[in-house]
Swiss-Prot record:
InterPro entries: Antimicrobial_4. It comes from Neoponera goeldii (Ponerine ant). This is M-poneritoxin-Ng1e. GO terms for molecular function: toxin activity. Has a broad spectrum of activity against both Gram-positive and Gram-negative bacteria and S.cerevisiae. Has insecticidal and hemolytic activities. May act by disrupting the integrity of the bacterial cell membrane. It is found in: Secreted; Target cell membrane. GO terms for biological process: defense response to bacterium; defense response to fungus; killing of cells of another organism.
Length: 24
């Protein structure tokens, strides 16, 4: 369970950071 959660977060975080940088 935790392995899948970490892999999902690893994929999600870069996209969230990209969206945050676009807003600025």
């Amino acid at each position: 369970f935790w392995g899948a959660l970490i892999k999902g977060a690893a994929k999600l975080i870069p996209s969230v950071v990209g969206l945050f940088k676009k807003k600025q």
